[in-house]
Each structure stands twice: as C-alpha cells, then as structure tokens.
C-alpha cells in the first residue's frame, strides 16, 4: 500500500510520488500520514518534512517554510511557501 504525496510551491511542482509515509511539521505539532488517513487540513510551520519511501526505511528530509497540508482520498498535498534545495 502506498500514499500519493505531492509537494508544491507557488512557483513549481517539487515532488509527485508514491511513498509509504510522510511526517509533516504542523503548527500544532508533527503528524504522520499513511495511505487511508482521514481527510483533514493543517497549516505547516518551518521545519523538515520526513518522507519514508518504504516501511522501515530511513527518512529523506525536505526543509520547508510555511504553507498548508491537505489529506484527502487522493493522498497528501503540501503547498509550501518555500522549499530549500
């Protein structure tokens, strides 16, 4: 089972891929998203998004600044104000 993850800035699509899990730095604390997660929206604070490509894999960290995260039946979309790298 996999989660569709998209990371977008106002300027471009940074990532669009199938992953195992993503941990997002929400303003109310970090939250993890797996496939089938209940729909919700959250604001994102400056920090690292951790992308786990498979169960048990070491995470890849992507530094982001601000934005919003939306979990829907389609997966997780993060609209970040800025992505480093």
Swiss-Prot record:
Where in the sequence is the signal peptide annotated? none
Q: Where is this gene product found?
A: Cell inner membrane
Keyword presence, Cell inner membrane: yes
UniProt key word Secreted: no
Molecular-function annotations in GO: ATP binding; proton-transporting ATP synthase activity, rotational mechanism
The UniProt keywords, alphabetically, are: ATP synthesis, Cell inner membrane, Cell membrane, CF(1), Hydrogen ion transport, Ion transport, Membrane, Transport
Topology within the bilayer: Peripheral membrane protein
Supply the CDD domains for this chain: F1-ATPase_delta (cd12152)
InterPro entries xref list: ATP_synth_F1_dsu/esu, ATP_synth_F1_dsu/esu_N, ATPsynth_dsu/esu_N
Chief location bin: membrane
Disulfide-bonded cysteines: none
Instruction: Give the UniProt entry's GO cellular component terms.
Output: plasma membrane; proton-transporting ATP synthase complex
For this protein, the record's NCBIfam families field holds: ATP_synt_epsi, PRK13449.1
> Matching PANTHER family, A to Z?
ATP SYNTHASE DELTA/EPSILON CHAIN, ATP SYNTHASE EPSILON CHAIN, CHLOROPLASTIC
Its biological function?
Produces ATP from ADP in the presence of a proton gradient across the membrane.
State the family named in the UniProt similarity comment for this chain: Belongs to the ATPase epsilon chain family.
Subunit note: F-type ATPases have 2 components, CF(1) - the catalytic core - and CF(0) - the membrane proton channel. CF(1) has five subunits: alpha(3), beta(3), gamma(1), delta(1), epsilon(1). CF(0) has three main subunits: a, b and c.
The protein's name: ATP synthase epsilon chain
Which species?
Novosphingobium aromaticivorans (strain ATCC 700278 / DSM 12444 / CCUG 56034 / CIP 105152 / NBRC 16084 / F199)
